[in-house]
């Protein structure tokens, strides 16, 4: 018997591209003279797309239904960018199996409509699908989820199903380095479908006998794995990717649909808020002030590139605010000494990333822009640092409000190790909208 498995990962609500992939599968799957499956590896949802924001991911699930998805798992965007309740209802209308072994609530229950593993019987061959997602522990904790060690959860689930399956497939939203470890730890795995780190393999990769397959990001590729079975075991396995550029174009209206769904008015009077990458504008000041107030901090730091578009309108809608601040970025409250706060101010004053093309960590803009400091100051001639007009004391504890993308080590390594509290699920646009109501 032969089985073809199509796979996508990290679509991130690039729904026009996904529609092309969906059309390709709709045309080609019926032509196969053997069984086929389609699996998605998570991060299909991304709230930077208006239609995804407006439907809290339900549109993405509807598209997966239309694509005749068979099995899917969750990525950090499904798990961490919507509320606890929203994840519990995300898959209410799903016509496919959603599996993830390492996210539970405080009572030990999986999210609604999600199973810890799944066995699919195809012509007598029993295929076990086990999945896990990346363990961003503090973020899940802030949303009242518990994320467990993915390696241990996968091992435990395999042992629970031992004797019930012929073929073992892992759906991993944990990244390529985790997948490589998994190959060494569990060589009995037949295929690992990978994601999260946006990697891809043109023809798959065999690692310790395990076939690794991955299809990049944003729908740039559709993955295809072909398995041949004899006596209920895999005897041959190959992988390839199909570039998006080789697929026919289609017409879509996702942006217009999202705009319509977010057309409700927020402010009914003229607003002029412009952005700049290299100096403080009123919009940047208001955003920094919003972060400081929302985090109940004494000061705040943001970057100007967070403001992606101007708002110059006689009336402001939800869509306008989303376009200005499309990022799935949360706020964070950091406690730190005066010494550490001075280090952060000094580093921000260097403006190392002002004109850098930034990507990842939730950032959905283009240019990073200059740092905007709120309630913080530095007098170069005296070498003194100030908070709200008072000199910062080395041994005193302060509270800084900022954004989660600064806490991963890329921009401010100091922040990675400091005690912090992530404030979720509100995004920058949510707190900025509240500030604009005072405008």
Question: Locations of the language-model features?
Answer:
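Flexible, glycine/charged-enriched surface loops at secondary-structure junctions
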Residues: 168-171, 268, 298-304, 356-360
């Amino acid at each position: 018997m032969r089985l073809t498995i199509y796979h996508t990962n990290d679509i991130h609500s690039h729904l026009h591209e996904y529609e092309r992939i969906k059309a390709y599968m709709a045309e080609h799957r019926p032509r196969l003279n053997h069984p086929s499956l389609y699996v998605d590896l998570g991060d299909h949802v991304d709230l930077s797309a208006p239609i995804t924001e407006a439907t809290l991911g339900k549109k993405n699930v509807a598209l997966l239904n239309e694509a005749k998805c068979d099995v899917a798992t969750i990525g950090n965007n499904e798990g961490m960018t919507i509320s606890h309740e929203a994840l519990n209802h995300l898959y209410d209308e799903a016509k496919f199996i959603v599996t993830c072994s390492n996210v539970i609530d405080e009572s030990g229950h999986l999210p609604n409509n999600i199973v810890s593993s799944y066995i699919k019987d195809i012509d007598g061959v029993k295929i076990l699908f086990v999945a896990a997602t990346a363990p961003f522990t503090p973020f899940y904790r802030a949303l009242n989820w518990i994320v467990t060690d993915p390696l241990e959860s996968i091992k435990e689930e395999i042992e629970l199903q031992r004797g019930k399956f012929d073929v073992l497939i892992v759906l991993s939203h944990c990244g390529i380095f985790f997948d490589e470890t998994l190959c060494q730890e569990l060589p009995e795995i037949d295929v690992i479908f990978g994601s999260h780190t946006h990697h891809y393999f043109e023809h798959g990769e065999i690692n310790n006998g395990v076939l690794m397959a991955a299809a990049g990001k944003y729908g740039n590729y559709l993955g295809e794995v072909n398995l041949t079975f004899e006596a209920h075991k895999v005897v041959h396995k190959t992988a390839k990717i199909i570039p998006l550029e080789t697929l026919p174009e289609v017409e879509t209206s996702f942006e217009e649909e999202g705009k319509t769904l977010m057309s409700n008015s927020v402010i009914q009077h003229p607003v002029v808020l412009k952005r700049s990458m290299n100096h403080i504008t009123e919009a940047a000041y208001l955003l920094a002030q919003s972060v400081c107030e929302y985090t109940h901090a004494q000061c705040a730091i943001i970057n100007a590139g967070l403001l992606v578009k101007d708002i110059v309108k006689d009336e402001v809608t939800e869509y306008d605010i989303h376009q200005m601040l499309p990022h799935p970025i949360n706020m964070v409250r950091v406690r730190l000494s005066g010494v550490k706060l001075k280090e952060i101010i000094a580093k921000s004053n260097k403006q190392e990333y002002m004109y850098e093309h930034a990507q990842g960590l939730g950032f959905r803009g283009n240019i990073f822009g200059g740092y905007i400091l709120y309630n913080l100051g530095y007098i170069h001639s005296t070498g003194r640092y100030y908070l709200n007009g008072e000199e910062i004391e080395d041994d005193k504890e302060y509270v800084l409000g900022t954004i989660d993308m600064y806490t991963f080590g890329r921009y401010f390594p100091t922040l990675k190790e400091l005690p912090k509290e992530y404030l979720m699920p509100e995004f920058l646009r949510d707190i900025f909208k509240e500030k604009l109501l005072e405008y």
